[in-house]
Amino acid sequence: MDISKRIAFIASQTDGRIVADIGCDHGYTACLAVLNGKAEKSYACDVAQGPLNHAKATIQACHLEDRVFPVLSNGLENVPDDTEQIVIAGMGGQLICTILSAFPAKTAQADSLILSPHKDPELVRQWLEENGWVIEQEYVIEDGNFYPLIRAVKGQMALEPWQQYYGLHVHPDEQAAAYLKDQKRRWTIIHNKTPEDKRKKASLRLQWIDQAALALGMEA
């Protein structure tokens, strides 16, 4: 399997006895979770037959036909009821929220969620806050771009604005520091190019980046 750093890390963070990977593409995450001993069984789920056929080929190549099962499913619609952990990665934050909201009973049956949006992570954190989930741990994955990985369990939390945009309980490592430095650079450019009377958004972002860095004991 030609595994990206991002997919390998996501799979390494699974720890549910039975894991469902939503939008499975080639089925790498579902297979790695089992191969690495992180899950006893997994479901590789996708809305389209094409990606599911790729997943079936991966499952067969790994000789995991008795432990990894392809499931044709529109989001969570057909995810089996014994699923304990839901993984959704490789899509935008808005789509992740839509998937989690579409079949609330399916979402509620899971004990934990592993979510890795490639954009708009603040929407995912807001959804978790509003729907009875608490962020247990976050990581930053650097693989060409920066990708947050959010692990959530059931519970209540109240996020500050900087936490909604830059994470809660973020693991303080080089990737997290590099992400905040990159954000600081980007928003400084935007701030400096924006007319003074329209800088509020950029100024807030820069303030939140500094708060996030302070929480990690880092300097952005």
Residue spans of the language-model regions?
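Conserved alpha-helix/loop element of class I SAM-dependent methyltransferases that forms part
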Residues: 1-17
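Conserved Rossmann-like nucleotide-cofactor binding loop
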Residues: 50
